[in-house]
């Protein structure tokens, strides 16, 4: 009887062994001012920033924050319960956009999203505070392959990121309550 039970459990265990770990991500405490929802705040800010990307030139701190938000959204938004109007193509859009912004910054392809988020947010804060030592520590070369100086230069002169802009717009749309028609509400 015990042998039979073990034989029944083995295929289930084998099936679980091949699954990759589930990615998770979070934004640091205090990232969103007030009592706002961090997912909504990230989508609205990133959508606004990438909707007018030309204004990012020479603004590496703003670029770092917006890309950190996109990295967070790529992990959290596709399965988020706050998405009121889910865009069906959001997950593949985010995957393609993530490759685009990671390539533009020189982020290691296998870098865990939380390390990317933490590094970019710490870099943004270090830039705001004028702390060069903290800036170098925020962008470790095993995650940011161009090193701190190279990554900072890339953040200050981002190339056009059309896939990122499209994914940011889709993320923003997915959180906006769709308009209800007066006719539909009376039916």
For the regions a protein language model found, what residue spans apply to each?
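N-terminal export leaders
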Residues: 1-7, 16
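Secondary-structure junction/capping motif
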Residues: 2, 34-37, 147
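Bacterial Sec signal peptide processing site at the extreme N-terminus
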Residues: 14-33
């Amino acid at each position: 009887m015990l042998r039979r039970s073990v034989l029944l459990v083995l295929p289930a265990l084998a099936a679980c062994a091949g699954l990759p770990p589930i990615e998770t991500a979070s934004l640091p405490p205090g990232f969103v001012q007030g009592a706002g929802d961090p997912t909504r705040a990230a989508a609205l800010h990133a959508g606004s920033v990438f909707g007018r990307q030309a204004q990012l030139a020479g603004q590496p701190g703003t670029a770092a924050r917006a890309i950190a938000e996109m990295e967070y959204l790529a992990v959290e938004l596709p399965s988020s319960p706050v998405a009121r109007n889910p865009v069906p193509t959001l997950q593949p859009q985010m995957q393609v956009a993530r490759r685009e912004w990671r390539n533009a910054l020189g982020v290691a392809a296998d870098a865990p999203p939380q390390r990317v988020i933490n590094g970019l947010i710490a870099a943004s804060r270090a830039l705001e505070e004028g702390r060069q030592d903290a800036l170098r520590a925020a962008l470790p070369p095993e995650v940011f392959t161009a090193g701190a100086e190279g990554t900072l230069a890339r953040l200050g002169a981002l190339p056009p990121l059309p896939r990122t802009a499209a994914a940011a717009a889709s993320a923003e749309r997915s959180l906006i309550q769709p308009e209800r028609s007066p006719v539909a509400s009376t039916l």
